[in-house]
Amino acid sequence: MLQSVSVMGVVIYLGLVGAGLVAAFAFSTLLRSIKLI
């Protein structure tokens, strides 16, 4: 029971980190495109 909860927490944590990286990459790309215009 406790092990499954910890695994679920790790999966959620990795998902949040991945989403944060994608959002940061998209944001930096958006800023670059604005500067180019």
From Swiss-Prot:
Entry protein name: Cytochrome b6-f complex subunit 6
GO BP annotation list: photosynthesis
Top-rank taxon, per record: Bacteria
Membrane topology summary: Single-pass membrane protein
Localisation: Cellular thylakoid membrane
GO cellular-component term (any): plasma membrane-derived thylakoid membrane
Function per UniProt: Component of the cytochrome b6-f complex, which mediates electron transfer between photosystem II (PSII) and photosystem I (PSI), cyclic electron flow around PSI, and state transitions. PetL is important for photoautotrophic growth as well as for electron transfer efficiency and stability of the cytochrome b6-f complex.
Subunit structure: The 4 large subunits of the cytochrome b6-f complex are cytochrome b6, subunit IV (17 kDa polypeptide, PetD), cytochrome f and the Rieske protein, while the 4 small subunits are PetG, PetL, PetM and PetN. The complex functions as a dimer.
